[in-house]
């Protein structure tokens, strides 16, 4: 059963520049549920990455609260947690390419276990079992002993997702996890993330430009335009929010089938 895990209260996000403060979105009141795959949609530059970085505590909110609710534990605002505590609660996969050399895929995935190791970072047999399970889940067993710097962009993305799985956090945030994958791999990745949300009751929230794929696999959508639209794919289709986002001359959206149609004669 889905329960509220991340709760946003009057949240305003943005960043400071030498010319002042740039507000990206403000007054957000919403919740991200456990046991659900939530996809964040929106045009480039609308603030998706800023929202993800704020939710991940990589940058501070301009105002408002981000509350983490955990079963049997008092709810706390995200700023009340230490970095060590957050590393056991939230796993993050960003689009930045890690500059890593002289490390194998298995060694990189093993870094996901660092929140659970002692001062010396020693991994025990149980930790390595978790690492190998994460590698198998993402279907990169053949890459296990490859050096990270020899990987393609798509292979590297899968490795970083395996690292997040090895971290065993109840919450995982991902910034465009399917960006460098071919279409079959995109589908497999989204299905994997959906399965993890369902079977392990994880809270999985990701940004994506794979519009039609998101409509097919997401439990909930967050659509960032001039305002934030939240609902199931069918709810946002019926409200007209999805059509308003994607339609333009030569492009129409079918709210019944959740598909985009292209009229080449009108392009």
What residue ranges belong to the model's regions?
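Conserved ABC ATPase "signature" region
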Residues: 110, 125-143
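ABC ATPase nucleotide-binding domains
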Residues: 246-267
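The feature captures the beta-strand-to-loop junction immediately N-terminal to the Walker
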Residues: 41-43
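Helix-to-loop junction immediately C-terminal to a conserved catalytic motif
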Residues: 56
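ABC ATPase NBD Q-loop/coupling interface
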Residues: 65-85
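Conserved ABC ATPase signature
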Residues: 147-151
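Catalytic Walker B motif of ABC-type/P-loop ATPase nucleotide-binding domains
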Residues: 172-175
